[in-house]
Regions:
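Generic structural signal for residues in well-ordered beta-strands
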Residues: 33, 71, 196-198, 313
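Active-site-adjacent beta-strand anchor residues
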Residues: 74, 96, 198-201, 247-249
Length: 366
């Protein structure tokens, strides 16, 4: 069964994570992806190990580069630039994350290529845009810090913390994918290609959703709340007799069900806790009262009982446990491609599902 993007050729000039993640998603959906790499060196993430796959590739590289072939092209030479131009002019989509202006100096900028190939969709990924922020380095950690994510993440005030993965890169890769698909749809109708531009800072600000909306619409600058939610309570990690448990109450009915199961139904009518705004205002004392009740049993027993009462509740899993959970639910989270286990494409399409045709490519000798 062919994928929905069969017949689309993607020239992938991107490196590291945001761009390669986007192009892998396109490849999973059937596009042919040709990854351009520096001869003898390749994508920097080829050297980002351990850990390594059984084939000796860094798992970082392998995680975002399946369903691609690779081509070694030295973009510093006229011959390499000519070869890259030929590839670009044959492609439907070009994806790049060079510093603004770099590809223009090689004769591979959008304006020059679009003049020769009006149907080309040219996706540029930067850290802070192509204007005043063009010279700022687009590193995920830097954007997490400068873009406000670390200011709302961490155990408490004065302890800003980054996310455990390069989340901004991943979100930006998703935005790039959406932009490319929208541009392909427009080309289907009009025959015209266009430039797609995404940047890490704008992607992060968009992904901050409710926190960002609270600032732009109400002027509220949020702070660090640990694992708590700024707008609803109780919605946090709670200690039990043996290990932590997540409880996520989203409305008054769930709160009533929770406290009945904990043996303290009177809390549902207490003025300090009867409504969500009241619970948010008294979140710390509420957490202390709930943890005193939760201390009477272990996490497994409480999860069984609280979930049975219709209240969202669950353990804090490590990755091994998370993948085991997905397997137990029939989600098939792992697919092995040419001997390399990779995380399965997350979107299920009933008529044109993702396909897995090539494992992460080895760097060609020349």
């Amino acid at each position: 069964m062919s994928g929905p993007l069969e017949g689309i050729l993607v020239a992938d000039f991107s490196r590291v994570l945001a761009g390669p993640y986007a192009t892998m998603l396109l490849g999973d959906l059937g596009a042919e992806v040709i990854k351009v790499e520096r001869p003898g060196h390749g994508d920097d993430t080829r050297a980002w190990g351990p850990p390594y796959t059984e084939r000796g590739q860094s798992t970082y590289f392998a995680g975002v580069n399946r369903n691609k072939t690779t081509r070694a092209i030295d973009l510093r030479t006229p011959q390499g630039q000519a070869e890259a131009r030929t590839l670009a002019l044959s492609a439907d989509v070009l994806v790049e994350n060079f510093k603004p202006g770099a590809l223009e100096r090689m004769g591979l900028g959008y304006a020059e290529l679009a003049a020769a190939h009006p149907g080309l969709i040219y996706c540029s990924i930067t850290g802070f845009g192509a204007g005043e922020g063009r010279d700022l380095p687009g590193y995920d950690l830097l954007v997490q810090a400068m873009g406000g994510l670390m200011s709302v993440t961490g155990p408490g005030p004065g302890e800003p913390t980054k996310a455990g993965v390069a989340l901004v890169d991943v979100i930006t890769g998703l935005h790039a994918t959406v932009g490319i698909l929208a541009a392909l749809r427009h080309r289907d109708v009009s025959g015209q290609g266009q430039r797609v531009e995404v940047n890490l800072l704008s992607s992060l600000l968009s992904a901050l959703v409710n926190q960002a909306s609270g600032y732009v619409a109400a002027g509220v600058v949020p702070g660090i709340l640990g694992n708590a939610h700024p707008s609803i309570a109780p919605y946090d990690v709670f200690a039990t007799a043996d290990r932590p448990l997540v409880i996520a109450v989203g409305n008054d009915g769930q709160f009533g069900a929770l406290v009945r199961e904990l043996g303290a139904p009177e809390l549902a009518s207490d003025p300090d806790y009867a409504t969500n705004p009241a619970r948010v205002a008294h979140r710390e004392q509420l957490k202390a009262r709930l943890e005193a009740l939760l201390a009477m049993q272990g996490a497994d027993e409480w999860q069984r009982r609280i979930t049975g009462a219709g209240v969202p509740c669950g353990p804090i899993n490590d990755l091994a446990q998370a993948f085991a959970l997905a397997e137990s639910l029939g989600l098939a989270p792992v697919v092995t491609v040419e001997g390399t286990p990779t995380v399965a494409h997350p979107i299920t399409l009933s008529q044109t599902p993702a396909t897995y045709r090539n494992g992460p490519p080895d760097l060609p000798s020349s």
